[in-house]
Each structure stands twice: as C-alpha cells, then as structure tokens.
Amino acid sequence: VLTFSTAIAQKKKVAVVTFYANKMVEFNELGIGSEELIKDVLDLRDNPDFNLSPLLEQYHTNFFTDYAKAFPFDLLPEASVVDSEKYQNFEPKYDLNAYDAQNYLNYGNYKYVYEGILGKANEESIAKLFADEADGVLFVNIDFAFEKGFGVGKTMSIKMRATTRIALYNKKGEKVFAFNEN
C-alpha cells in the first residue's frame, strides 16, 4: 500500500496600512545650509504644479499588480483594510497637525501612520488592530531627495531621487524587515 501525504502550507496574509508620498523634498546632499533652501522646499511642497498624485497612482498600481506578487505572503484586499471602521477610527500616536499633514500625500483612504525610530506605539497598535485577519502589517511610502548633478563654476544641475520604504511588522508589532529602494 502506497500512501501520499500532502502538507499545504497556508500563505501568510498582510494588511497594507500606509501608502503615501512625502512632499518635503530632502536637500542635504546639495551641501547648502537649510536656511537658504527651506523656504524653496516649502514653496515647492505647496505649489499645485508639484503634483505627485500621478506618480503615487502609478506606484500604487504597480505595487499591487506587479510588485506584490514577489512577496512571500498575500495582501489583504485593500478595501477591507482602509475602508474598515476600525482603520478609519484608528488614531495614531504622534498624529499630524494640520500644518505637518501638508507634507504628505496619502493614497485614497490611507492614513498617515508614523513608522520608524519613534513609531513603536503605532507599529504595535495597528498590528494588533488587524491581528485577527492578518499575520502582519506593511507600511509603504515614497520619499524624494535632491541630488547634485553636473556642475561647472557656480552652476549645477540638480536631480531628484525617489526612494520607497517598505516595512513589514508581525502581528505583535515587531519589525520583520524594512528596506529602502531607489
């Protein structure tokens, strides 16, 4: 008698809890003091011609249709996360005031939830919020930075670099991985 035993490993599920672009362009690499450039960066942030919506829309589409396939886990349906009452009622620690909120462009119904060095309270509380449905939570954002280009004399070109940060936390709010990709 020949018997076969098949073990089916259930794929983990993850909730994407942030998806935003940071409109405050970093300028440290230019080597110019912040007092000279901060006004220009704020003017750029507030300029309606500096429209990051199409870029964020394209990144969102690519992320969910292409990039997500490379993850070793499945993503919960987006609407079940961002449109849920518990997500909409979630109030992150270090919530943004109206002035600081201008720095971020959230995609759709996503909220800005700080993740990082001082974000432990947010990471743990939002992970626990989805612990019944998901094995973890994913924070996704795009940052921009000016870089020095080619220069002669006192003139130079400036390039802009886009960097995405993707950070995964388990259902306890412990970091599994985080990476930045240009």
Q: Residues of each region from the PLM?
A:
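Bacterial Sec-dependent N-terminal signal peptides
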Residues: 1-12
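Solvent-exposed loop/turn segments at secondary-structure junctions
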Residues: 21-23, 82-85, 144-147
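Amphipathic beta-strand/beta-sheet edge segments enriched in Tyr/Trp
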Residues: 136-139, 148-182
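N-terminal segment of the mature soluble domain
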Residues: 31-139, 171-179
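Short, solvent-exposed loop/turn and secondary-structure capping segments
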Residues: 27-28
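Short alpha-helical segments and helix-capping/turn motifs at coil-helix boundaries
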Residues: 2, 122-125, 148-150
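Short N-terminal segments immediately surrounding and downstream of signal-peptide cleavage
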Residues: 10-24
